[in-house]
Regions:
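Hydrophobic, well-ordered secondary-structure elements that form the walls
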Residues: 17, 24, 53, 69, ...
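Membrane-interface helix-loop junctions in multi-pass transport and translocation proteins
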Residues: 50-52, 110-142, 146
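Transmembrane helix-loop junctions in multipass membrane proteins, especially transporters and channels
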Residues: 51-60, 92-99, 121-126, 149-157
Length: 164
């Protein structure tokens, strides 16, 4: 997913330089589609191969550790779709020249993680730990999606192009 983000940043920068705004939206849709496909594949791979892969690092005698690790990674991989949006939208915003705006997504993630660590983890324990990253990604998305739409609208106005 990180590679998708890097790709979309370069792609966005090149197309804004070439004044081809229509290609930016197409590239976004393509990268999001790839990310969502990856998310589904990763989910099923971890669901069925996760215990085997974890056993490469955790001894078979550590049954409770293996169970907790599988539980944790299943929560993580189940939320790869929101993580796709974090990478694609954040990096596209940066590639389009709005780096300062993209930083705020990190602020949203940090605030979510801080609130989770202060309030949810003490109340729910390991269950909350498993959801900490996914909730942080969703918090970033709550900022990033409208931010991208704002950037897109601003660029269309600047270039005198109707929105696609």
């Amino acid at each position: 997913l990180d590679a998708l983000g890097t790709t979309v940043a370069t792609y966005g920068g090149q197309n804004i330089g070439a004044k081809k705004l229509d290609r930016i939206s197409k590239g976004m849709r393509t990268c999001v589609a790839f990310g969502l496909i990856y998310s589904v594949i990763a989910f099923f791979l971890i669901k069925y191969l996760g215990p085997t892969l974890l056993s490469l690092f955790i001894g078979a005698e550590e049954k409770s550790v293996l169970a907790d690790a599988q539980y944790f990674i299943m929560h993580w991989v189940a939320f790869c779709a929101p993580l796709t949006f974090v990478y694609v939208f954040r990096f596209m915003i940066q590639g389009l020249g709005f780096s300062k705006l993209a930083v705020f997504a990190g602020v949203f993630e940090m605030l979510a993680r801080g609130l989770i660590s202060l309030f949810w983890i003490p109340a729910a324990g390991f269950e909350a730990v498993c959801f900490a990253s996914p909730v942080a990604w969703i918090a970033a998305d709550v900022f990033l999606v409208p931010a991208y739409l704002w950037v897109r609208k601003k660029l269309h106005r600047e270039f005198g192009v109707t929105a696609d």
